[in-house]
From Swiss-Prot:
One Pfam family linked to the record: PK_Tyr_Ser-Thr
InterPro entries per the UniProt record, alphabetical: Kinase-like_dom_sf (IPR011009), Prot_kinase_dom (IPR000719), Protein_kinase_ATP_BS (IPR017441), Ser-Thr/Tyr_kinase_cat_dom (IPR001245), Ser/Thr_kinase_AS (IPR008271)
Positions where Phosphoserine occurs in the chain: 185
Catalyzed reaction equations: L-seryl-[protein] + ATP = O-phospho-L-seryl-[protein] + ADP + H(+); L-threonyl-[protein] + ATP = O-phospho-L-threonyl-[protein] + ADP + H(+)
Residues of the active site: 181 (proton acceptor)
Membership in a protein family: Belongs to the protein kinase superfamily. Ser/Thr protein kinase family. CRK subfamily.
Amino acids binding ATP: 62-70, 84
Annotated gene: CRK44
Residues found modified as Phosphothreonine: 223
Residue span(s) of domain Protein kinase: 56-336
UniProt keyword annotations, A-Z: ATP-binding, Kinase, Nucleotide-binding, Phosphoprotein, Serine/threonine-protein kinase, Transferase
Matches recorded under PROSITE patterns: PROTEIN_KINASE_ATP (PS00107), PROTEIN_KINASE_DOM (PS50011), PROTEIN_KINASE_ST (PS00108)
Entry protein name: Cysteine-rich receptor-like protein kinase 44
Phosphotyrosine: residues bearing it: 129, 231
């Protein structure tokens, strides 16, 4: 392999430093070559995709994803596809694009969207995914009519599926991955309303020994309302960043309202603050979508999910459970959950007792949260 070597002065460098310099150079080049090699296996013809989307017609436009617009397409075989067209103003360069292709191509989980291929041509960058006619959870859960389709069984299946998908990304895949943009519009729904996590343009990889560590970035990317406070304000992120976003999503699914929603009589309270206020005052029924109460009542399963959601949105990342703990909580029939502390971005009256782990709980709250848990400490 022909390589243009850099001209450097090595007189003052130790032989060991020279060795590590060239080791890093060749290793980096190998990684990039391997990414491109993997990506070529999935490369599709641009004209094929252009025709499939009717030349990216506005009628085929499905919405906006991370870094670009998404279109519906139909291949000659009749297969329906979703095409993510990278915006030239998005800020996602070739490295990020190749990263998404090479990464997603290797991910195999029933709760992750499957990548079918990609395309490079000139300045065009396209990602081709499997298509879901139900589109995203956002189209259902925040629509007063379509939300009625989502009974509690479906909502619980969505919550559990997203939890398993994130656990796979954090701990079980070949790579260890932080999604960084977990939200309702990035959860697609198949014909049976099973959830599929989508949009991997903002993911970050980390080593196994970094799973409990915090990393930093000067380029904060994501969606406000779902961002953890430490990430939004300081660029600090970890697996607990995704956990926070998951908690927001869980509470949205249960209430059927966006995170920026506030009740008319309490316009200063957004969703997290409203849920916390109701929880503290023992008015848990007010947290739940009325359509669920009418058809199912306030079940232990619903109470458990509210409790888990509040544990996830705690201000301190160290207080939030891991996705492994969350999956265990969701699967357990008998579990005693730790008492959640005040959520991040709380806009109501601060109750100092909510920050005290030894404080005696309000008996009204305790009576609502008598789902028993044996594993108190998150892994």
């Amino acid at each position: 392999m022909k390589v243009d070597f850099l001209v450097i002065k090595v007189e003052k460098l130790s032989s060991l430093r020279v060795f590590y310099f060239f080791l890093f150079f060749f290793e980096s080049k190998y990684v990039e070559d391997q990414k491109i090699k993997d990506a070529k296996l999935l490369q599709l013809d641009f004209d094929t995709i252009r025709l499939a989307t009717n030349d990216f017609s506005p009628y085929n436009h499905l919405g906006e994803g991370g870094f670009g617009a998404v279109y519906k397409g139909v291949l000659d075989s009749g297969e329906e596809i979703a095409v993510k067209r990278l915006s030239m103003k998005s800020g996602q360069g070739d490295n990020e694009f190749v990263n998404e292709v090479s990464l997603v191509a290797k991910l195999q989980h029933r709760n992750l969207v499957r990548l079918l291929g990609f395309c490079f041509k000139g300045e065009e960058r396209l990602l081709i995914y499997e298509f879901f006619k139900n589109t995203s959870l956002e189209k259902f859960i925040f629509d007063s009519d379509r939300r009625m389709i989502l009974d509690w069984e479906k909502r619980y299946r969505i919550i559990s599926g997203v939890a398993r998908g994130l656990l796979y990304l954090h701990e079980d895949s070949h790579f260890k991955i932080i999604h960084r943009d977990m939200k309702a519009s990035n959860v697609l729904l198949d014909d049976a309303m099973n959830p599929k996590i989508a949009d991997f343009g903002m993911v970050k990889l980390f080593n196994t020994d970094q799973t409990s560590q915090t990393m930093f970035t000067s380029k904060v990317a994501g969606t406000y309302g779902y961002m953890a406070p430490e990430y939004a304000m300081s660029g600090q992120f970890s697996v607990k960043t995704d956990v926070f976003s998951f908690g927001v999503l869980v509470l949205e699914i249960i209430k059927g309202k966006k995170n920026n929603w506030s009740p008319e009589e309490q316009s200063s309270l957004f969703l997290l603050s409203y849920v916390w206020k109701c929880w503290r005052e023992g008015e848990v029924l007010n947290i739940v979508d009325p359509s669920l109460i009418e058809t199912r009542g306030l079940s232990d399963e619903i109470r458990k999910c509210i409790h888990i959601g509040l544990l996830c949105v705690q201000e301190n990342p160290g207080s939030r459970p891991t996705m492994a703990s969350i999956v265990r909580m969701l699967n357990a029939n008998s579990f005693t959950l730790p008492r959640p502390l005040q959520p991040a971005f709380y806009s109501g009256v601060v109750d100092s007792s909510s920050r005290d782990n030894n404080h005696t709980r309000n008996p009204r709250i305790a009576s609502l949260n008598d789902v028993t848990i044996t594993e108190l400490d998150p892994r």
